[in-house]
Amino acid sequence: MSLHLSNVILHQLCKNDQDELVVKLRPASLENDASTENLVAELHRVFHSKAGKGFGSFQSDSEFQFWLQEMRKGERDFYDFSQISANRLKEELIKYPFADEGILVFAEYQSLATDYLFIGILPMNQSLKVTEGLDISATDYLDITKMDIAARIDLSSYETDKESNRYLQYIKGRVGRKVADFFLDFLQADIGLDTKQQNLVLMQAVDDFCADSKLEKQEVNEYKKQVYNYCNEQIKSGEEVQISELSGELPPSQDGTSFMDFTKEQGYELEESFPGDRSTVRKLTKYVGAGGGLNISFDSLLLGERIFYDPETDTLTIKGTPPNLKDQLSRN
């Protein structure tokens, strides 16, 4: 991975004797060497692979934004920026029930010609190691893959387009942990691009395009399968869904209208590109539902062939149950 490291520093969030969260500040930035470059490269990779990230942009009166601008202009050094930001982060973090201890990392770097600032809290875990004398001893390590409190600012986008609503990305965190609220408060930012909504709009546009083109059922299934295959490949490779690229892979309507032209003519508010949402796009080829003790998923092409739905009686009929399910049912 091509990565150029400008600055990186670690501080520590820990509890004092009064069980209060405090910041233990490192006296200086880390040296830029192979170890720190490998650390930041792994942080970048893991953050990039995390699903369900949110987007945002700074509020006009954001203090953090002001400190960041000073640092980027050379009016404030990176260490001072990290120190003042670490203390602000701690003050916001103690307001939330997940005031975690951990290693706080600030990293300024460039990857693939894009400048980034990464901020994250890395959990510490214990493991075992074998010493040179073949004894067993405990060792602490950074559990980077488990980080769920992290944000990354695309500095290149921010500095060229401050009106953008997506230069700031953050991990939304686990259910019940208001990590999104915490980072928005800490950075003094507002929610930006809604990726879930973008994916839902895309699904609606696909449905409407198929209906407008008067496609037969099999043609609809094939069309949706193409959309799914493209979106799924983008998700797996960590790339965004590009509407123009997707449109180029899809057949036009009978009157020659491309999918992209259709979305523009009909006024769908789709961004040129956005991250795909796996749970949403899978509904292109599957019917999925859960509730009341039931969890049902089946290929959409089976509806009307082996699976039938009667809306009047709200009944789903399955003809030809899977062998493993049939075996379980026959035993009761």
From Swiss-Prot:
Q: Which residues form a coiled coil?
A: none
Q: Which GO terms describe its molecular function?
A: double-stranded DNA binding; single-stranded RNA binding
Gene Ontology CC terms: bacterial nucleoid; cytoplasm
Q: What is its main location?
A: cytoplasm
What is the superkingdom listed in this entry's lineage?
A: Bacteria
Keyword Cytoplasm tagged: yes
Q: Where in the cell is it found?
A: Cytoplasm, Nucleoid
Instruction: Enumerate the UniProt keywords alphabetically.
Output: Cytoplasm
What InterPro entries does this protein map onto?
A: Nucleoid_associated_NdpA
- Keyword Zinc-finger in the entry? The reply is no
State the similarity comment: Belongs to the YejK family.
Q: Which PANTHER family match?
A: NUCLEOID-ASSOCIATED PROTEIN YEJK, PTHR38772
Q: Which NCBIfam families match?
A: PRK00378.1 (NF001557)
Task: Report what the protein is called.
Answer: Nucleoid-associated protein VP2128
The species is Vibrio parahaemolyticus serotype O3:K6 (strain RIMD 2210633)
